[in-house]
Structures are given as C-alpha cells and as structure tokens.
Amino acid sequence: MFHRIEEALEDLKKGKVVIVCDDENRENEGDFIALAEYITPETINFMITHGRGLVCVPITEGYAERLQLEPMVSHNTDSHHTAFTVSIDHVSTTTGISAHERATTIQELLNPASKGADFNRPGHIFPLIAKEGGVLRRAGHTEAAVDLAKLCGAEPAGVICEIINEDGTMARVPDLIECAKQFDIKMITIEDLIAYRRHHETLVTREAEITLPTDFGTFHAIGYSNSLDTKEHIALVKGDISTGEPVLVRVHSECLTGDVFGSHRCDCGPQLHAALAQIEREGKGVLLYMRQEGRGIGLLNKLRAYKLQEEGFDTVEANEKLGFPADLRDYGIGAQILKDLGLQSLRLLTNNPRKIAGLQGYDLEVVERVPLQMPAKEENKSYLQTKVNKLGHLLNL
C-alpha cells in the first residue's frame, strides 16, 4: 500500500510528485508534495487539476525572515496551528494565478537574491512556516515537505496541495491509493517519515541521573535536554524496564497549579500521584514528566485561560480566545526519551486517545490503554465534561 521513504526521496530528487498521508486522528488527508527547488508550471498544473486543493509552499523560518513574510493573522486559531504567512506573488507576474506565474513566484521565493520588496502582498502562493525540528516536533504536511527537501539535499522548501475527490469530499486512504496507482506516484505516511528520521537522528540527551526517594517509592530519575528548545524533562524509572515486556508508562504534562498547589480546577495533581503509586505497586514502569504547562501554552497563558473560564468560556474556548489551539502539546521529544530508555511496547496510563495516536506515530506500540480516572470535584466537573465532549477524553462522568 505505502512505499518506503527512500523510494519517495528518489522520485522527489527527479522532480516528481509524491503523496504524503497523515494520521487518521489528525487531518486524515493526503497531499501532493514536490520539491520547491524543482517546481515547474507542469507540476503546478498537475496539482491544481488532480489535487484541487490549495497550493502552499512550506518553508523554514529563515526564508520567512529574509523575505519579511509576516504571519497571515496575529492570532492563529487553526485547529492544527498551521503557520500561514501573508500570501504573495512575484512582482514580475501579472495576475499571479496561472500555473506558469505560480511556478515563477515559487522559483523567485527560493532565489537567494530575492528581497521582501520583490513580492506583492496578498497573492496566490501561500507560504507556510515549518516548525524547527520538522515532523519530530509537529506531524504535519508542512513539516513533512521541508523534511523531505532536506533529506533530498535540496533547498528546504516544498510545494504541497491537498487532494480532494471529484465530488468535493476529502480524499481518504482508499481514494489516495487509487490516485497513486492512476498516476504511478509513490505514497508515504508522515508516521513512516517520523520513523525514518528517528532512526537516523537523535534530539534528546541524558544530562543527569540520580536516585530519587519519594512519598510513593524510590525511583531512578533521569534528566533530559533536547535540541529543539530549552525545555528540560525528567523520567522517573521504576524497576527493570529492559525485559522487552510492555511497560506501564504515564506521560504527564507539567501542571504547576495542580501538581504543586493542589488546584481543584483540574485533575492533574491526583493523576500524577495515582500514576506514581500505580507504577510503584507494579514494581516496574516509567513516569515521564514533560514541561508542557497548560497543554503547551505556558503558565501565564494558562492563568489567562483560567480567567476567561471564570467569565464563562470552557477550557477549549478559552485557549482559542487567546489565539491557541485546544491542545499545543507535541509528543516527539517524549517519544524519543521513551525510546532512549529502551521502550518499544507500552501500557499507557491515559484517558486521552490523541496521546495514544501521538506516541504511536513515533514508532512506539501502545498495547493497552490503562484508564487513569480521578473522582470529579465540584470545581472541575465542567472542565472534565469539556474534555470528554470536545477533546475526546474517555471518562465516565
């Protein structure tokens, strides 16, 4: 059904188009992807004729800074936080919409002599800024395109177009398979691209290891840094986790208010304590404490979100009101830490199916979801209900 990453890279180097699919629990779609360095009017025409989606150009932040490409909006409320810049046309184009002129704009975007003033705004080419770290940081088509370009040794920019069926519906995997067969195109998944990069790259470093006695038992604590940002994470390991058997794991995102101050607004503190106690009882397991405060928006923004909740917004609406998606967490670094610990098969302590999908995308097998439900308090009943209704959490309330 799917091709190897190496096969896709060979075709991309020849100027061909490939199809890249993401996870069914994310956008669940496929995009045509080509290298921007080799773009032609013919490739653009193929994409708009058979893809029917929006033609975008994933680039690095360096390109955006050099060409003064500002964000399209000041508050991005897109559910996947896709980083659109202002759209552009090269000044040499007329309307900018033809396949030839769109190709010209893309070619000039890559021209090292180009300046911001060489592009009209708005236009018909939509640059997207890829996250530093690529698909290991964000498992999206934007990052996949830039990663593929880098792996090909080309300029770090791609051209992508969503694939839509003739009836206007989004093409899903069965449709994409037929499309790939019809046009003899290689088809890969972002999950496989992540696995390929993980096999060839390491982004986390063990910095310190100690014995940590706690109220719940004694753990082996390992501190990690990573090359994507300045955040430091810690793994608390219990027992021998090198046997190859599935290991009980809790991936816990930092919550200062709940973990330290015992806030009743959430169930984070009780979940943390219950997870440590359960790992201690089993005599083997890992609690990975990730510095992703407030589902990734940070402490101060979490407090601002709490203020909005006091005004009647729920937890998802509050995030969106502040310009954030409902959940900004990524699992790439956490997955690398778990892999560094030698884990392959997990029994995951979680109520969040998205966390399962997030980790499985990084070559970790979740063989069992172990529920971690805490008794609801009067102050967090509404919060927990929103997690069920809008975030898909598996709770019995």
From Swiss-Prot:
Binding site for GTP: 250-254, 271, 293-295, 315, 350, 355
Stretch list, region GTP cyclohydrolase II: 200-397
GO MF term (any one): zinc ion binding
Residues the record lists as binding D-ribulose 5-phosphate: 26-27, 31, 138-142, 162
GO CC entries: cytosol
Residues that, per the record, bind Zn(2+): 255, 266, 268
Cofactor(s) required for function per UniProt: Mg(2+); Mn(2+); Zn(2+)
Protein role: Catalyzes the conversion of D-ribulose 5-phosphate to formate and 3,4-dihydroxy-2-butanone 4-phosphate. Catalyzes the conversion of GTP to 2,5-diamino-6-ribosylamino-4(3H)-pyrimidinone 5'-phosphate (DARP), formate and pyrophosphate.
Family (UniProt): In the N-terminal section; belongs to the DHBP synthase family. In the C-terminal section; belongs to the GTP cyclohydrolase II family.
Protein name according to UniProt: Riboflavin biosynthesis protein RibBA
Underlying gene: ribBA
